[in-house]
Every structure is written in C-alpha cells, then in structure tokens.
Amino acid sequence: MSKNLTIVARIEANADKVELVKAELLKLVAPTMKETGCVQYDLHQDNENSAVFLFYENWESRELWQQHMNSSHLAAFIKATEGSLASFILNEMTKLSYA
C-alpha cells in the first residue's frame, strides 16, 4: 500500500463571507499544485450549503504536507480570512482500499 497521506479539510465560511473565502481558497490551488509532494489538491463546494468547502488532498508524505502547512500562500489565506471562518476541520487520513 502507498505511504501517501490524504488530507480532508472542511472549511465553513461565515454566511456573509462566502465569496471572500471562496476567492481566497481558489488562490491556494495553483501554488499548492506546484509544491513538491503535492499529488492532488481538489477544492469542492457543497451543493446545498454554499458556505461549506472541502479540500481533498493527497501528498507523497506527511513531511511534505507539513511544508505546505508552513507555506507563504497558506499564511496569506489565514490572514485574508481572519474572522471569516465559522469552522476549519482538518483530518489526516490513510487509504485502506483501492478501486
């Protein structure tokens, strides 16, 4: 089995900040995809609650994901969305089965 790390990040914007949060999340995609170790970095928006976003990420290792967590573009996102998030839940996952 692969040693890749899967990250599922659930971000919920405050009701009045959905468009701001969405724009800032979209800014993360291009620079993150260029990072060493990033295999997949997909952003989703809930069909019924537009304030809910989900990143589905795959990284070559936890160490390389940690480098991402310390990146300047992630720091810029945190600063730009300060006070705009209702919740931010991060899960580190291990893939158990393959289709």
State where each predicted segment sits.
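Glycine-rich beta-strand-turn "strand-cap" elements at beta-sheet edges
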Residues: S2-L5, L43-E48, I78-A99
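An amphipathic, aromatic/His-enriched active-site/gating alpha helix that lines ligand/cofactor pockets
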Residues: K27, M33-V39, N58-N91
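Short, surface-exposed ligand-recognition loops at beta-strand->loop->(often short) alpha-helix junctions
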Residues: A13-V18
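Active-site-flanking beta-strand signature of metal-NTP-handling nucleotidyl enzymes
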Residues: T6-I11
